[in-house]
From Swiss-Prot:
GO terms for cellular component: cell surface; extracellular region; phosphopyruvate hydratase complex. InterPro entries: Enolase (IPR000941), Enolase-like_C_sf (IPR036849), Enolase-like_N (IPR029017), Enolase_C (IPR020810), Enolase_CS (IPR020809), Enolase_N (IPR020811). Mg(2+) binds at residues 243, 286, 312. GO terms for molecular function: magnesium ion binding; phosphopyruvate hydratase activity. The keyword Transport does not apply. (2R)-2-phosphoglycerate binds at residues 164, 337, 366-367, 388. This is Enolase. Its cofactor is Mg(2+). SMART domains: Enolase_C, Enolase_N. It comes from Methanococcus aeolicus (strain ATCC BAA-1280 / DSM 17508 / OCM 812 / Nankai-3).
Length: 425
């Protein structure tokens, strides 16, 4: 009997993320390997996300995670010692049962997820396999198209833009390494465009490494992207994507969206999206409406047939909410954030449900990130075809891109998803 996969030790600690806020790191030791994981944290979060447990004490302005760390060390770890690290679903289910809440609010999704990811990495290490191959097997070979957030707004920046992310997608590249190069060159060109129009101080960056120029107009922002792409020479290779995070500028009291100070109805906002997609090469829109507006999402999906409509706050990587969306035709793609649901197994379940119903999958980071590059491996393991992990700047973002370059080199003959983002096969 092979005991090398048996879990010998689990240890959690408090570390800091890219915003200087505390988060949970977990190390798992097996008889034959080792894995560690750091969980991310979001700024604009969906109401239905699993609970990120915070101490709410004076330390770190109430954002400490010592309670979550103690939950790992005192409650979860003693229960999992001796488990076979390959039994990922059994381990994840066991932790969910230990928590006994619908939203992981007792132990904390940040505690549970850190253990879940570290267990997978320890098992992969014990098997002498890269994580993407351990999770996905020999059929994991598709490299995702990056959605690079090069202009930040909303909750991620200090400017007046309502929309949270303006992204570039190099669908015309031939490989992930070429895609990253195209985006990096465009990013540097964009900086020159911004500095020439607004001055050097306008080149400051937001949480995800994108620039945060002093603009408030959506079209003006898209014009900046258009100019940068043209100047970089990639007009035929690079398209645009938006993350509107509409729940953040939705006024529930009067059922209006506040855009540049003007109240817009759902229908008026949908008309704005149609105009933008006619005027610019926008191929993907994330969270265009409020997180509870399944009907509005369904209407927009019908109106913009050639555009990917991504549910983030709408679905929160939750299979029950995704099932509702599928039944109603709300959106046609899932944004997969592992910390929204809290375990690796449940994240994979959500991705598989999306794939089975013709939905695309975008594996995503959070605005509060770390050097952990697990999501790069997950994107390849699932053959997702798309990854969203910020600008080609800041170490917590480039860690994921550099891991994708390594994976591409290791696979040898990968397929780059390119224009087939929702169905990369």
């Amino acid at each position: 009997m092979d005991n090398s996969f048996d879990i010998l030790d689990i240890k959690a600690r408090e570390v800091i993320d890219s915003r200087g806020n505390p988060t949970v790191e977990v190390e798992v030791l097996t008889a034959g390997g080792y894995g560690s994981a750091i969980v991310p944290s979001g700024a604009s979060t969906g109401t239905h996300e699993a609970v990120e447990l915070r101490d709410k004490s004076q330390r770190f302005g109430g954002k400490g995670v010592l309670v979550a760390v103690d939950n790992v060390n005192s409650i979860i770890a003693p229960e999992l010692i001796g488990f076979d690290s390959r039994t990922q679903r059994e381990i994840d289910t066991y932790m969910i049962e230990l928590d006994r809440t619908a939203n992981k609010g007792k132990l904390g999704a940040n505690a549970i997820l850190a253990v879940s990811m570290a267990v997978a990495k320890a098992a992969a290490s014990t098997a002498s396999l890269p994580l993407y191959k351990y999770i996905g097997g020999c059929n994991s070979y598709i490299m995702p198209v990056p959605m690079m957030n090069v202009i930040n707004g909303g909750e991620h920046a200090g400017n007046a833009l309502e929309f949270q992310e303006f992204m570039i997608m190099p669908v015309g590249a031939d490989s992930i390494s070429e895609a990253i190069r195209m985006c990096a060159e465009t990013y540097h060109t964009l900086k020159k465009v911004i500095v020439s129009k607004y001055g050097k101080n306008a080149s400051n960056v937001g949480d995800e490494g994108g620039f945060a120029p002093p603009v408030s107009d959506i079209r003006e922002t898209l014009d900046l992207l258009t100019d940068a792409v043209k100047m970089a020479g990639y007009e035929d290779e690079i398209t645009f994507a938006l993350d509107c995070a509409a729940s953040e500028f939705y006024n529930k009291d009067d059922n209006k969206y506040i855009v540049k100070g003007a109240p817009l109805s759902s229908d008026q906002l949908i008309s704005l999206y149609k105009e933008i997609c006619d005027e610019y090469p926008v191929i993907s829109i994330e969270d265009p409406l409020d997180e509870e507006d399944f009907e509005g999402f369904a209407s927009l999906t019908k109106e913009l047939k050639g555009v990917q409509i991504v549910g983030d706050d709408l679905f929160v990587t939750n299979t029950e909410r995704l099932k509702k969306g599928i039944e109603m035709g709300a959106g046609n793609a899932l944004l997969l954030k592992v910390n929204q649901i809290g375990t690796l197994s449940e994240s994979i379940d959500a991705a598989n449900l999306a794939f089975r119903n013709g939905y695309g999958v975008v594996v995503s980071h959070r605005s509060g990130e770390s050097e952990d590059n697990t999501i790069a491996d997950i994107s390849v393991a699932l053959n997702a075809g798309q990854i969203k992990t910020g600008a080609p700047a800041r170490g917590e973002r480039t860690a994921k891109y550099n891991q994708l370059i390594r994976i591409e080199e290791e696979i040898g003959y990968p397929k780059y998803a390119g224009k087939n983002i929702r169905c990369p096969f």
